[in-house]
């Protein structure tokens, strides 16, 4: 038996799982030939918390605080998809005012997510300055969230049939002021970054994905639109009231890391356009919160009442999920966030399958980094934009 010659000069290194550039607890086993990447294997699961199984033992209103822990930088989208599923299952109509408020919150959340992508991405490729700049705008955004929802992150704001509370007095003017200020901030980022020769050297032509290849891998969001595919669920599905606003799908045809950066920068400007139109055209009427009305209709248990002893054993009043199945999706900052829901004539879902965009976008990483340099791994991984909370669930 002849033993094949083993190459002695290949080096296997671990990147992560607790490295600042890993964007969470991601571990990469990288095989190197000098500086060239021969192979890369992502190791997942360090942040797995059984989110799908938890959903099967909770009513929707009980489960809402959990979903903000998937993508903890864009929590409004996880809340939106969680209430959209039972709304479609039960044919629940959302009032126009509540729909406008949802769109405003979703787009503010998209900007917050893209900002917190931009800073670490620039830090990954060696530019520290934008990392500190993004926190100015992010702080203003979180002030708006706190005023409207009571929380800076993990907002728990969306409800079946509407939102938890109406916008407070003066909030709309404050938000319009932020929009005007933020547009100047985006111009500043573009001056600082977009034509910077060192930045272009690091990202141009790095991590190329063609349009057909992107579709075959099931990519979505900026990863797909940067490869020349004009696919945005806000235009395709027309959920909430996006079709009432004038805005453009941001896309590029180059398919490299620079194109993905340009798509996200453009999306922030488009989000501001949507928010301004929604704020100026927001109608009156109810913001609706069906769960609150359901709670208000229940009898308060007396201290010595028979029911009081069993109050912790009873599920909170909620909607029965009819015995059918459906798939709902929204255009999250990272791509298509979907829920496959199976009802069983119970207040608990029979199956709650999460389709996270980060998990599917991450699958192409080993192919993108092959035959690239070691330093390009951080550029490519950063341009994909993953959050391990939603990857591992």
From Swiss-Prot:
GO terms for biological process: photosynthesis, light reaction. It is a peripheral membrane protein. It holds the Pfam family Complex1_49kDa. Coiled coil: none annotated. It is found in: Plastid, Chloroplast thylakoid membrane. InterPro entries: NADH_Q_OxRdtase_suD, NADH_UbQ_OxRdtase_49kDa_CS, NDH1_su_D/H, NiFe-Hase_large. Its main location: plastid. GO terms for cellular component: chloroplast thylakoid membrane. GO terms for molecular function: NAD binding; oxidoreductase activity, acting on NAD(P)H, quinone or similar compound as acceptor; quinone binding. The keyword Chloroplast applies. Its EC number is 7.1.1.-. Keywords: Chloroplast, Membrane, NAD, NADP, Plastid, Plastoquinone, Quinone, Thylakoid, Translocase, Transport. It catalyses: a plastoquinone + NADH + (n+1) H(+)(in) = a plastoquinol + NAD(+) + n H(+)(out); a plastoquinone + NADPH + (n+1) H(+)(in) = a plastoquinol + NADP(+) + n H(+)(out). The keyword Nuclease does not apply. NDH shuttles electrons from NAD(P)H:plastoquinone, via FMN and iron-sulfur (Fe-S) centers, to quinones in the photosynthetic chain and possibly in a chloroplast respiratory chain. The immediate electron acceptor for the enzyme in this species is believed to be plastoquinone. Couples the redox reaction to proton translocation, and thus conserves the redox energy in a proton gradient. Belongs to the complex I 49 kDa subunit family. HAMAP family: NDH1_NuoD. NDH is composed of at least 16 different subunits, 5 of which are encoded in the nucleus. This is NAD(P)H-quinone oxidoreductase subunit H, chloroplastic. It comes from Nuphar advena. The gene is ndhH.
């Amino acid at each position: 038996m002849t033993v094949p010659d083993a190459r002695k000069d290949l080096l296997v290194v671990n990147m992560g799982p607790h490295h600042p550039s890993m964007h969470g607890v991601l571990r990469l086993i990288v095989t190197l030939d000098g500086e060239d990447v021969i192979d890369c294997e992502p190791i997942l699961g360090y942040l797995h918390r059984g989110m799908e199984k938890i959903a099967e033992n909770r009513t929707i209103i009980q489960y809402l605080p959990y979903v903000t822990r998937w993508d903890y930088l864009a929590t409004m989208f996880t809340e939106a998809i969680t209430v959209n599923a039972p709304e479609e299952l039960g044919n629940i109509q959302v009032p126009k005012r509540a729909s406008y408020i949802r769109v405003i919150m979703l787009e503010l959340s998209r900007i917050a997510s893209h900002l917190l992508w931009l800073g670490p991405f620039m830090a990954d490729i060696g530019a520290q300055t934008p990392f500190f700049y993004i926190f100015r705008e992010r702080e203003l955004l979180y002030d708006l969230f706190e005023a409207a929802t009571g929380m800076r992150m993990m907002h728990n704001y969306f409800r079946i049939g509407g939102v938890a509370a109406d916008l407070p007095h003066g909030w709309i003017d404050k938000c319009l002021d932020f929009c005007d200020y933020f547009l100047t901030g985006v111009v500043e980022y573009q001056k600082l970054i977009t034509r910077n020769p060192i930045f272009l050297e690091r990202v141009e032509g790095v991590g190329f994905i063609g349009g057909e290849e992107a579709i075959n891998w099931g990519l979505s969001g900026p990863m797909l639109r940067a490869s020349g595919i004009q696919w945005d669920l806000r235009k395709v599905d027309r959920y909430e009231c996006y079709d009432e606003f004038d805005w453009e799908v941001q896309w590029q045809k180059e398919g490299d890391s620079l194109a993905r950066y340009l798509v996200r920068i453009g999306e922030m400007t488009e989000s501001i356009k949507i928010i301004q139109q929604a704020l100026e055209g927001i109608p009156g009427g109810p913001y609706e919160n069906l769960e609150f009305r359901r709670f208000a209709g229940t009898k308060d248990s007396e201290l010595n009442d028979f029911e009081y002893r069993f109050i912790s054993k009873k599920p909170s009043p909620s909607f029965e999920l009819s015995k059918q199945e459906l798939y709902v999706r929204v255009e999250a900052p990272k791509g298509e966030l979907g829920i496959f829901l199976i009802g069983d004539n119970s207040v608990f879902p029979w199956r709650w399958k999460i389709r996270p965009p980060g998990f599917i976008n991450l699958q192409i990483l080993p192919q993108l980094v092959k035959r690239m340099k070691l330093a390009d791994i951080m550029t490519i991984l950063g341009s994909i934009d993953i959050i391990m909370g939603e990857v591992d669930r």
